[in-house]
């Protein structure tokens, strides 16, 4: 166990000025970060079920990549009992466990040096639709993770969650208007100003804007639940053939955009469709285990924003959520077809979904820079 309660060195320049860029998720990784789930007003049974699931995710990742887990001091002993022995526990305080959104975006340069971008965070909407209050501890998470690796830190003047962006490492950034242009994120910035900041801090050239994300996604439609890059020039889209499903017009609109765009290198996109699980709904028993607090209520009968697109690429494997016996095998086979050189590892992930996200949301990769 280590302690990361010290800030990282802050830079005054911007990554693009310094020759740094955000690499694609399939670039070599030196580590993956996760955070311990414990909020009783978001995770049933004070996180017990989620903790067991996070341990399985960490174990699946650990076969390919070292795993670090941020854990508040009060839960370290408990985490040591639950987590696989290969997971490095780091004392980091947090309001919740979404490492993708509160962790840093690590950027690299041609020499393999790594630095981190620390974005502003307001719990997915602040006082205008945010998911909990306060979020002060979450705002400190990225700097503490960067300190653990000895990386210098860029502080970006933009409210942004890691799950709201995907890049191909070759100049293209994909996102959703539903999230990035939402009035509860950066109300004083125009689309053009947001793009300019993303150019500065991700060093990207071209943007693919999808209008909306997955139906009932409480993050305001994060791209990482809806669509991702598989490799340069190829994307994977969350899809349903059911035209009566509320998800259909969202996926169809996204498909129309993807079919009529090119990436930063001028390539037309090859589009893979990944089937929607379910639809899935929160049960009475599952909702009863969540206590009242400042978090979003977990209501019986509420539709869950389940998506197989919410997977992690980590070195030689794909760790993806098992969500529905009717479609899990189909999703696994499609992923194997898309990633023939990767090992496809499914982890039962309903407990993560009940808390509002999935495997990609609870992980944040640290690229090797090589």
Curated annotation (Swiss-Prot):
Gene source species: Shewanella sp. (strain MR-4)
Keywords linked to the UniProt accession: Hydrolase
Statement: the UniProt record of this protein carries the keyword Hydrolase: yes
GO molecular-function term, one example from the UniProt record: agmatine deiminase activity
GO process annotations (BP): putrescine biosynthetic process
Protein name: Putative agmatine deiminase
Statement: the UniProt record of this protein carries the keyword Hydrolase: yes
Enzyme kind, highest EC tier: hydrolase
Family: Belongs to the agmatine deiminase family.
NCBIfam families named among the record's database cross-references: agmatine_aguA, PRK13551.1
Reaction catalysis annotation: agmatine + H2O = N-carbamoylputrescine + NH4(+)
EC number: 3.5.3.12
PANTHER family in the cross-refs: AGMATINE DEIMINASE-RELATED
HAMAP family on file: Agmatine_deimin (MF_01841)
């Amino acid at each position: 166990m280590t302690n990361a309660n010290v800030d990282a060195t802050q830079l005054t320049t911007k990554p693009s000025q310094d020759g740094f860029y955000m690499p694609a998720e399939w670039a070599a990784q030196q580590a993956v970060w996760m955070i311990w789930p414990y909020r009783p007003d978001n995770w049933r049974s004070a996180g017990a079920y989620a903790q067991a699931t996070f341990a399985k995710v960490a174990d699946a990742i650990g076969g390919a990549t070292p795993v670090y887990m941020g854990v508040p001091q009060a839960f370290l002993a408990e985490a040591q009992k639950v987590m696989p022995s290969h997971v490095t526990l780091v004392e980091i305080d947090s309001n919740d466990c979404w490492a993708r959104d509160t962790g840093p975006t690590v950027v690299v340069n041609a020499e393999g040096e790594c630095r981190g971008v620390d974005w502003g965070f307001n719990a997915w909407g602040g006082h205008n639709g945010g998911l909990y209050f306060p979020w002060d501890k979450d705002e400190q998470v990225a700097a503490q993770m960067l300190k653990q690796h000895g990386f210098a830190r860029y502080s970006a003047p933009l409210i942004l969650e890691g799950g709201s962006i995907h890049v191909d490492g070759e100049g293209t950034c994909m996102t959703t208007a539903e999230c990035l242009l939402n009035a509860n994120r950066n109300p004083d910035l125009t689309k053009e100003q947001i793009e300019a900041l993303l150019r500065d801090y991700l060093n990207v050239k071209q943007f693919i804007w999808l209008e909306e994300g997955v139906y009932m996604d409480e993050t305001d439609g994060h791209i990482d639940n809806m669509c991702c890059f598989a490799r340069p020039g190829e994307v994977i889209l969350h899809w349903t053939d059911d035209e009566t499903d509320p998800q259909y017009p969202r996926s169809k609109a996204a498909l129309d955009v993807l079919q009529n765009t090119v990436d930063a290198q001028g390539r037309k996109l090859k589009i893979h469709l990944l089937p929607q699980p379910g639809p899935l709904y929160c049960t009475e028993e599952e909702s009863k285990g969540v206590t009242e607090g400042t978090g979003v209520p977990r209501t019986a009968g509420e539709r869950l924003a389940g998506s197989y697109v919410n997977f992690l690429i980590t070195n030689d494997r794909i760790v993806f959520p098992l969500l529905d016996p009717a479609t899990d095998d189909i999703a696994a086979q499609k992923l194997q077809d898309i990633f023939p050189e990767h090992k496809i590892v499914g982890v039962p992930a309903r407990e993560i979904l009940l808390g509002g996200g999935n495997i990609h949301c609870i992980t944040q990769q640290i690229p090797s820079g090589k």
